[in-house]
């Protein structure tokens, strides 16, 4: 069995270094640049004073996520999704929202929505 050499010389069992830089973006209610070795993910949170129609009048909040790759986040430029998002992007957004809702208590902050852009 051949073991491939990683570009950064890590062993196959070694994790990439992980760092979090908070307050990365000055205009949002919250932001963080997360780095996993050479992979960087910018997450920005926005709070809006509304909820989806199915939650109106129930006093509960909502958390959702939006996702998009930057055009030069890969060796070849990725075209921006304009009018309609693709299936992969849609599924990643659904996954982000579901994961966030599974770990956030939405009962204590009224009818507000937190939108996390990644």
Could you say what each language-model-derived stretch is?
Residues 107-118:
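Hydrophobic, well-structured mid-protein blocks that either form specific transmembrane helices
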Residues 1-26:
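Short, Gly/Pro- and small/polar-rich lid/capping loops
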Residues 17, 62, 113:
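A residue-level signal for beta-strand positions that form part of recognition/binding surfaces
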Residues 18-22, 78, 116:
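Generic structural motif
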Residues 24, 32-109:
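Glycine-rich, flexible beta-strand/loop modules in the N-terminal catalytic cores of phosphate-handling
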């Amino acid at each position: 069995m051949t073991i491939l050499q990683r570009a950064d010389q890590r062993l196959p069992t070694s994790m990439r270094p992980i760092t979090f830089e908070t307050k990365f973006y000055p205009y949002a209610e919250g932001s963080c640049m997360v780095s996993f070795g050479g992979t960087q993910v910018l997450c920005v949170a926005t709070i809006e004073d509304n909820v989806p129609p199915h939650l109106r009048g129930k006093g509960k909040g909502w958390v959702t996520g939006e996702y998009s790759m930057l055009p030069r986040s890969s060796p070849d430029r990725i075209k921006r999704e304009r009018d309609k998002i693709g299936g992969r992007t849609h599924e990643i957004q659904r996954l982000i929202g579901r994961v966030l809702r599974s770990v956030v208590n939405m009962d204590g902050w009224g009818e507000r929505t937190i939108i996390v852009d990644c």
